[in-house]
Amino acid sequence: MQLSDLIAMAAPVDVHPERCIRAFSPRATCSKCVQLCPNGSIRIDGGVVSVDTCDGCGRCIQACPHDVFEMDFPAALKMPQDGPLIICCRRHDFSDMPVLAANCLQQFTWLELAILVERFGEVVLFADQTTCADCDFDWFPEGQQMLLERYGLAAYAEKLRVIRESDEMEAYLQAHFGDLNTRRVYMKNQLGHVRQAAEKYTRQSLSGYLDAFRETVHPERALVFEKTQSQTLLLHELYESAPERDPAQEIPLQALTNTHCRFCRSCEKLCPWQAIAIVEEEGRAVLAHHDVLCARCGLCLDICPEHGLHWDRGLTVENIAAPHWRVLAEATARECERCGEIFYTTEEEQTRCAVCRNKY
């Protein structure tokens, strides 16, 4: 067995349990990572997520909406910016060339690849067909290009290149780097860019949006999940810089809908992203949702006592590029026939408040 194979087998994944929605609320039921891990190595006990062993397939990264799992994306952001970013599997030996040797390339989500394209101008994935054919991980790299197009980022998809032949890869390296293909020059460039930290890049790009949203909604409340970032906020930023986009294009992003509500405020109080708001004024109550603030963690569905919140389709590029508060439910004030208290509900024939309904 070659050294590159041993390195690939180690493939450790960094786990940030404090970011998990299960750590935030005992009512949360999200278990996407557990369901998708092919080895059954991910456990969630007492709200704490842990990984026993890891083969580096990266499926947990694709599944998690809260960036609990992390492998090579921060390292990719730190690569030198004097040329395109080239990423290959660790089973290949490009140690003397400016290539990022990573764990399985399927760890990189379409959104991460779009961010890398924005940063480097072009991203090349060397998915050698021979190596991938013998690998236990079932991955379709062109699928990431298709997802970019479905999210209205066709210009980014064009700058994401997939190379499957070794000869084509060698030719590409020679054409784009020439005399950079030496360890000495490569290491010199790496040290020159060491200050370009991934954490600083991503946080700075988000700080303006977070401040703006805090000023308009619950400015007195601090955002609970400052430990991580909303992936939809990053998509919003990409749309702002996208050269061409169709505002009416439907995207494969979940839209929150409501079938019935009694405006108890459980979802509003517990949403870690402050993406849900209930406003009462002049005898009316409105339940609203912000598509960009929302991280699609599903906690609101878990805690709704009426089971009235659901995921649906129908979001467009415009919903994320030009976000606004989308009304999910409205109701007029009414007086409980039993106790006389004012209450709200979307059930037209309901004459009792929730307390009297449950008590009597």
Predicted regions and their residues:
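Extreme N-terminal leader/targeting regions
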Residues: 1-70
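Non-ligating segments of multi-cofactor redox enzymes
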Residues: 1-31, 82-284, 292-293, 299-302, ...
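ABC transporter nucleotide-binding domain
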Residues: 52, 73-84
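Short, structured interface segments
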Residues: 57-76, 303-318
